[in-house]
């Protein structure tokens, strides 16, 4: 009898709990941003010692991130369909400790040729690994995304060495143009027009962290149930324009879009994060690893069998964290790397949103702005 009574009480308690959960919707806690400050450009060029240039033509292009004084490099590749260059060289156990440039480019593996143009341009500037006799070998890492044959162009119409040279010549430390630009010119992300995006984080004490990304993901950057960006909660000071929640029918349309057959094997998110603090190669690699969380926050699913997701880190080393005034704030070395990595993750997620907000509709592939006008009060 006692056993039956206890069973009845437990069942009733479960029913009451189920009823309460059905009536009360509990919103999950949102992660806290690292900071509410960005650099003046809100881009990777806010990092001292970093320049960016892009060149594109006929819906494909190349973006170059230059470190004129060199930078310690790290990289972490988590997609299962990558196309990269010089990633082995950036391993902490390998010799070369300075990187001159990172190339993000369209063209799939063919697009790696754009890095040749950047190398030749740097050689003319005498920037690179000194091999004696007045000769240098520029260290240029690269990652590619798949865009050949899109938007009606020929499959053979893709970036080459000239794209890389022109992008390097255009590099400067000012505001970065976003959207259908450079490596983002032919990008498509989860059924919407992808693009190039950037963002920065000001951690105080002169410490800057920035990110730049070309978004060509298999997964969507948009929650199909709401039409909102997955990474919208990371917005700093209204940088996304204080977007409104789209109408229900827009969300339903995007749900159908998300279920559409994807372009398997034609996707990736390729990124560079940078900071002006001094890091070792191992620490730079750790920052790249942590920055991948920014992709996972902003794109679902991410790091798939069909993506080539890669994150490079450049540390220009103009600041030494051990000499900063606010040592009580910065703490020990491991904690400092944690802060830089967490800031890089936030900046990368926000850069992905900026890429989507600045993209423009091309042919049958709509931009977020055209797909969700209600988000902008239209």
Describe the function of each predicted region:
Residues 1-9:
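Bacterial N-terminal signal peptides that target proteins for export
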Residues 9-17:
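Bacterial N-terminal signal peptides
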Residues 17-25:
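Bacterial Sec-dependent signal peptides at the C-terminal "C-region" and cleavage site
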Residues 24-109, 113, 124-378:
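A structural signal for small-residue-enriched, beta-sheet-centric alpha/beta enzyme cores
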Residues 114-118:
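Short Gly/Thr/Asp-enriched flexible loops that form oxyanion-binding sites at enzyme active sites
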Residues 121:
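Active-site catalytic microenvironments for nucleophilic, acid-base chemistry
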């Amino acid at each position: 009898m006692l056993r039956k009574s206890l069973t009845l009480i437990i069942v009733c308690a479960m029913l009451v709990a189920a009823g309460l959960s059905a009536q009360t919707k509990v919103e999950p806690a949102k992660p806290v941003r690292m900071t509410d400050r960005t650099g003046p450009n809100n881009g990777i060029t806010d990092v001292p010692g970093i320049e960016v240039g892009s060149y594109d033509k006929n819906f494909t292009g190349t973006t170059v991130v230059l470190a004129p004084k060199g930078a310690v490099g790290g990289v972490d590749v988590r997609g299962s369909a990558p196309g990269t260059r010089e990633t082995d060289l950036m391993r902490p156990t390998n010799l070369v400790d300075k990187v001159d440039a990172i190339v993000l480019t369209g063209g799939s593996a063919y697009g790696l040729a754009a890095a040749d143009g950047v190398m030749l341009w740097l050689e003319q500037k005498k920037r690179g690994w000194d091999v004696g006799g007045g000769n240098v070998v520029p260290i240029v890492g690269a990652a590619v995304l798949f865009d050949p044959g899109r938007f009606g162009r020929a499959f053979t119409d893709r970036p080459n060495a000239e794209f890389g040279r022109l992008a390097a010549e255009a590099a400067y430390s000012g505001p970065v143009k976003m959207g259908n630009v450079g490596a983002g010119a032919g990008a498509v992300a989860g059924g919407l027009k992808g693009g190039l995006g950037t963002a920065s984080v000001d951690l105080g004490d002169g410490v800057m962290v920035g990110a730049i990304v070309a978004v060509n993901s298999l997964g969507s950057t948009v929650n199909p149930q709401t039409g909102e960006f997955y990474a919208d909660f990371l917005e700093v000071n209204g940088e996304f324009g204080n977007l409104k929640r789209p109408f229900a029918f827009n969300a339903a349309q995007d749900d159908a879009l998300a279920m559409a057959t994807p372009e398997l094997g034609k996707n990736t998110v390729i990124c560079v994060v940078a900071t002006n603090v001094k890091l070792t190669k191992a620490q730079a690699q750790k920052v790249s690893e942590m920055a991948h969380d920014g992709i996972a926050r902003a794109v679902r699913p991410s790091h798939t069998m069909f993506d080539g997701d890669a994150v490079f880190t450049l540390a220009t080393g103009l600041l030494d964290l051990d000499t900063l005034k606010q040592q009580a704030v910065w703490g020990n070395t491991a904690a400092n790397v944690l802060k830089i990595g967490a800031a890089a993750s936030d900046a990368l997620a926000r850069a992905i949103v900026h890429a989507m907000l600045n993209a423009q509709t091309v042919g049958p592939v709509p931009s977020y702005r055209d797909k969700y006008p209600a988000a902008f009060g239209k």
